[in-house]
Amino acid sequence: MLNISTNMMINQTLNFDSNQESQKNKTERISKTKLTRELITKTDHDIYVDDISFLQREDNVNVSQIDLTARGVLNPEDQGVLHKSTEFGVFNKNKTGLPASVDLKIKQNSFFSVKQPDFNKYLISDFVEIQRNSFFTLLEKGIIEEFSKRNPITNSKKTMEIFFYPDYYQLTPPEYSPSQAIIKSKSYTSKLYIPVQLTDKSKNIIKLKWVYIGDIPLMTKRGHFILNGCARVIVNQMVRSPGIYYQKKIYENFSNKWSEKPENTFTRYFADLICNRGTWLRIEMDKYNKIWAQMKRVPKIPIMWFLIAVGLTDKIVLKTVMDSKILLYNLDEDPLNPRKKPLPYVKTPPAAWSAIYNIVFAKKIKAQEKAKKMLELTEGNPSSKSQTKNKTSASKKSKTLNVANTKGKTPAENIKTLSELIDLEKALFLKSEQGRKWIFNKFMNPRTYDLGKVGRVNFNRKLKLSISQDITTLTPQDLLAATNNLILVSKGLRELDDIDHLKNRRVRTSGELIQIQIGVGLVRLEKTIREKMTYASGLSSLPSQKFAFRSSKQRNQSPVGDAENATQLTIGNLINTKPFNGALREFFGTSPLSQFMDQINPLAELTHKRRLSSMGPGGVTRDSATLAIRGIHPSHYGRICPVETPEGKNTGLVNSLTAYARVNAAGYIETPFYRVYKGQVQKKTGLYFFSAKQEEKIKLGAPDLYTSEIGFLPKASIPVRIVEDFTKISRNEIQYVGVAPIQMISIATSLIPFFEHDDANRALMGSNMQRQAVPILKPQRPIVGTGLEARAVSDSGHVITAKSSGIVMYTSSKEIIIYSLQ
């Protein structure tokens, strides 16, 4: 007892001495620094604290060595500090003003030592980061990319040229702030100005001018847009990633509708070539092993014709493709239909172009043949005034106005019919050039077909090619390798693709959706500019036969303006803001992905901005969506919440991002993991984010595995997941472990206390009904919470936030008073 009491007295003496020294250091530091009082009130714009390097309070402790990078979310009820860290997450407040959830130990030197494992439980990024980052990418790269694709715009004779310089574009400050736009029912937009150069080669004139293109809606700091006084959110869209995917479909034939077992079955293998913009192409092998190229609203084309039409020769095709006899099956005679003529064998691209044109435009050719017969009948009918033995050409007879004067019709009534028949007669001569243009515009024109860099990477990886990422159209090598792989898939030498796997699906964020719509507006703008330049150069003169019978008002009206304005062509006359503004107005006003923001409570707003929709343009519909699309896939772990989804027709089609998930630059969803090195969880090295494709190559442990004080896993065998299989391995074989148990669920679901004991159906209802709760007048802390409540409110932007670090002296719902060290 004597030894114990002596030791206690010694420790108290040491603590007293150290406290005296720390107090002296504190007074010296305060005397050298100047305390300034800063008042922060609630303004129109949301204010965020960039960082709080340290917090100093009037206690006998020194916390200068603790780095708490925070955004200063403050509790209106107390005058202490509630920390929300962009790096370490949300903490509760204790009496000392320091995070209570952090295990802090006071040493004899009065310094705090932070226990690292508890800190790393809260490494959650900003919840609205997906919206802000996508819009930043639009301003940084998207606008420049879309204008660069339209350069240059020329007339038909190439004598006039419009060239944009998007790298130097400027945005003006918005006319209204977000709050003013809401009050006055205006839009929170900025005007876009771009330098434009007009070159007239015929007159050797070059003009350069800043031009107003249109209005760009701006995103607020809370991640939404304000149009006509209404807050709108652009929902993120989940679509199939551009690339090539091999699948099969099994067909069953039943003898009658009452039979239980199918009479026979057959399998069709096909490859879907998906692009960002343009026509989707399917290469399909039918039950007779015939391979066809298929497109929407176009008859199927033999694959041999298609490969030769894109520039390959028959020798290259037959030598490269495995079991090349399959390519010739659809050129053989059909034993089931012997009357049908076999398709011809082509060797050169011009022959293939003509053959494809005959198939694609078969209906048009039949109509032209009927017109030709009508012409022959018309030419054989003599005129009423004079009979001729020798037939003359229709163009020569049209001058006499006596050609088609049959059954009492006057010559003037038949002029219009005759001119149409003459036009059809000219179109009867099919040229291979027309087929070549059709193939080029469908798959090889960068203005009409675009794989994107993501699609090019997927093509190269799947087909083992090394084509440059700058080439975003289909190449002959792509189609040849795709056909060869389809044959290998049908023989079981290649694996099929799982289209529901997240490695084959990507997210179109709000910035990308706006960029696509900007491209639509620029296509319309390009069309109007080209029409104006063509008219100004005198190339829009109409044929005399069509122009002769127009009314005097129509003849006097000019499609662009009068002749004087056409001769004095300027950049301002060429560029109009209507196409650009109209395209954006259509998207924000009528698109199903642009929705009125849910503002019932902060959680509803936050969830709305993190929503993922599989519907919309280029997506699926409620009626066509199958259970496979709506279901939960193993790759959703840590990326898409398996609980939070609507009830009804939209079940599984509308989802939410998980709490830790983020979207990378390519549009794939990533989730974080800790690295494990020789059985030790390396939390200090930071987080490793993996997409669904990268996750297939690693061995993952559960996030709730027991670890020692220094981070070592148990020596016993540990359950892990490898791709979709579960097994047990030693701790030295584990590569990564999860970050936290809430990694697999969304923010709304993570607010449910004791979620693991809840029924799945009730948890789904609870996640959705939390968004319908009406906020109370006097907010209070939850009696039972999960620790993410303050973080959800702070990221939604509904609370006052401090803009600098310091000592909090007073907080309320209207103002924050801080003493800061400067």
From Swiss-Prot:
Belongs to the RNA polymerase beta chain family. In plastids the minimal PEP RNA polymerase catalytic core is composed of four subunits: alpha, beta, beta', and beta''. When a (nuclear-encoded) sigma factor is associated with the core the holoenzyme is formed, which can initiate transcription. GO terms for cellular component: chloroplast; DNA-directed RNA polymerase complex; mitochondrion. It is found in: Plastid, Chloroplast. It comes from Chlamydomonas reinhardtii. Its main location: plastid. It holds the Pfam family RNA_pol_Rpb2_3. Keywords: Chloroplast, DNA-directed RNA polymerase, Nucleotidyltransferase, Plastid, Transcription, Transferase. It is an enzyme of class 2 (transferase). Its EC number is 2.7.7.6. This is DNA-directed RNA polymerase subunit beta N-terminal section. One of its GO terms (molecular function) is DNA-directed RNA polymerase activity. The keyword Transferase applies. Residues 376-408 are annotated as: Disordered. Residues 383-393 have a biased composition (Low complexity). Gene3D superfamilies: 3.90.1100.10. InterPro entries: DNA-dir_RNA_pol_su2 (IPR015712), RNA_pol_bsu_protrusion (IPR007644), RNA_pol_Rpb2_2 (IPR007642), RNA_pol_Rpb2_3 (IPR007645). DNA-dependent RNA polymerase catalyzes the transcription of DNA into RNA using the four ribonucleoside triphosphates as substrates. In C.reinhardtii the gene for this protein is split in two. It catalyses: RNA(n) + a ribonucleoside 5'-triphosphate = RNA(n+1) + diphosphate. One of its GO terms (biological process) is DNA-templated transcription. The keyword Transferase applies.
